[in-house]
Amino acid sequence: STELRQTGKPHFLANLALALISAAIAGALFLLVLLLIEGWRLSPIGAAIVVSVMPLAALLGSRLDRLVPSARARAAAGAILVSGGLGGLALLPRAEVALTVPPQVMIGIGLALVLSALTETALSGRAPQAIHGGWTISARHAGVVIGILAVTPIFTHDIAQQRHDAINAGTAVVLDSNVPPLLKLDLAQKIESRLDDEKGKVPTIGPAFEPLPTDPEEHDQVVQLHEELQDQLNRGATHAFSPSFGLAALIGLLSLIPIGLARRVEL
């Protein structure tokens, strides 16, 4: 068995890596839930079902760690997988739930590998274990706070900018549509009212198109216009999250520095 040595000094590099990777993971969960609910307008239950892919993948990853005895290799592989998954979320081409599944699988497996390896390293050969376990928990909690604080200002700025760009693009869609002029004017006023009511958010424009015209031709034109506008808004919302996901991926990659610098054979 491993001989424990009485020391109050925590494993600085392992805990630093834990903080950085926890910041990246917090960014992943926080941003993905916001994207699904506020951007793509999924229900909270629907969003919860979608993000459940991540913990399920983590269960798979917990089985894979037995195949890699080196804690350093597991930590590095896990950090790369987490960052790669975040990079995939940053590059989502459109609002489609299925496209979030592969990046989530990468993040979940990476999470299991890196957290187990770094926690094992931070505690290895140290006593009392309760004290050093507390250091690992503190590092992870600090990372969560840092991650959310890091991505929130970028996300807030970008969602406002993308909202503005999507509105401009949507205006062009309305003007170019085949909807009769009077109906087009009425829709424009309703859409503007919806935008004013939901400043600072990705707007929900569905109510602006109700009630739908009874004339079959106008009905089809309005439905098509609604779909085109919603597509513009969804695309804008998706792109608004890209820089924040990218920052979270970069934070995850930074954890490779303390992992690589650690001199202990266990890492």
Show which residues each predicted segment covers.
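General structural signal for secondary-structure boundaries
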Residues: 96, 145, 180-184, 264-265
